[in-house]
Amino acid sequence: QKQLHTGFSEDELERLRRYFLELKCSVAGRFLWQLGTATVDRLGLASLQNCAFTVIDSPIVPFTWAMDMLALGAGVGYNLQKKHVDKLPPVREWFKPPTRVNDGGADFIIPDSREGWVRFLAKTLKAAFLSERPEKGTFTYSTQVIRGKGTPIRGFGGVASGPEDLVWGIGKISDILIKRAGRKIRPIDALDIMNIIGHIIVAGNVRRSAQLALGDCDDIEFLLAKRWDLGNIPSWRAMSNNSVACDDPRDLHEYFWHGYEGRGEPLNFSGCV
């Protein structure tokens, strides 16, 4: 009650205790796992969520928030319809990938924490989308304080993956952004960035990284994003289940049905949001 701030009366608490003891009700497994721990004191309800959702309509927070929630174990859904992704500014023409130097003189020494990894992603996205002059379009970083691979992780459990998966992921995200220099990113680019974030978290050896992407029913690139039979599809796209927003099934593009014919993976559809 103190951690969740439920405001139950003593009578309500007693009744709830009785229901638990009589096995008439229960709470989610994540509550059983974490309630009463310092993790909940520090993170609040965020660490107890099974599901989360965001809209990709700004250049930083949707991605960093998704990374944070995935690292906490929540499944994350996200809307990347063109009407939302178009709200992001163009990628700066002077953006360059951050450079790893691994010494105390780096612009950013990545903290050995979930929050530190999220801040590294945020700095990269800020350099790409929001930097105001060329010298701010990149930065140097160090991974020297990140625990080595195989080191036990206290708190959420598991073992550390070391810094290499994070370095790989930020490099891949930077590659995607550089290809769009001077232009806005497309929904397929937003999907790739989210999927790479998911891959980083899976590689981090703590969570499985469940994602659900919601795109436009006429976005050909999105509809073909997981057509493995076409070849040259990035493996990280396996990180998300993909769905399309559509008011009328008759508006669905023919490519939508290919997944049900054994070509690629079948998509679901839902009403527009």
Residue ranges and their predicted role:
Residues 1-273:
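Extended catalytic cores of very large enzyme megasubunits
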